[in-house]
Amino acid sequence: MASARRRRIKKKKQVISKKIEFRYRGYTLEELQQMPLREFAKLLPARQRRTLLRGLTPQQKKLAMKIKKARRLLNKGKEPRIIRTHCRDFVITPDMVGLTFGVYNGKEFVEVKVTPEMIGHYLGEFSLTRKPVQHGAPGMGATRSSMFVPIK
């Protein structure tokens, strides 16, 4: 009885420790990186697919050239610098995985390290343009009802 319980616990630990391989629509990261861009676009949701198939704007072409240059450096074993860009509407493709981008949010460049889970999203989704509101304690003059809050 006790040995069967120990075997079940051991089996659970083995399942938990097993690393799950990333897949996007049934394809591994290596398969996606070998795939041509038009073929990859067919796997994307409609909005991203349309964006890629319509072609790149001059700003996006410039960013694509920077990505190719950084990818070559990464393949040689050198660490590429952060790629700074204002282009928030660029769809994250498999060849961008592992690179670091500085995405402009209207005030500063937010550092975005691209992981496989980000494939198919836009760069701008990971660089928030608005700061989340952090409400403070109510004080005098905050609202009409705050006049009844005792002054410290």
Curated annotation (Swiss-Prot):
Gene Ontology annotations of biological process type: ribosomal small subunit assembly; translation
Domain of life of the source: Archaea
Role: Protein S19 forms a complex with S13 that binds strongly to the 16S ribosomal RNA.
Protein known as: Small ribosomal subunit protein uS19
Cysteines engaged in disulfide bonds, as pairs: none
Organism: Methanocaldococcus jannaschii (strain ATCC 43067 / DSM 2661 / JAL-1 / JCM 10045 / NBRC 100440) (Methanococcus jannaschii)
One example GO MF annotation: rRNA binding
Gene Ontology annotations for the cellular component aspect, listed alphabetically: cytosolic small ribosomal subunit
Tagged with keyword Amino-acid biosynthesis: no
Keywords from the named record: Ribonucleoprotein, Ribosomal protein, RNA-binding, rRNA-binding
PANTHER family xrefs: RIBOSOMAL PROTEIN S19P FAMILY MEMBER, SMALL RIBOSOMAL SUBUNIT PROTEIN US19
Family assignment from sequence similarity: Belongs to the universal ribosomal protein uS19 family.
InterPro entries in the cross-refs: Ribosomal_uS19, Ribosomal_uS19_CS, Ribosomal_uS19_euk/arc, Ribosomal_uS19_SF
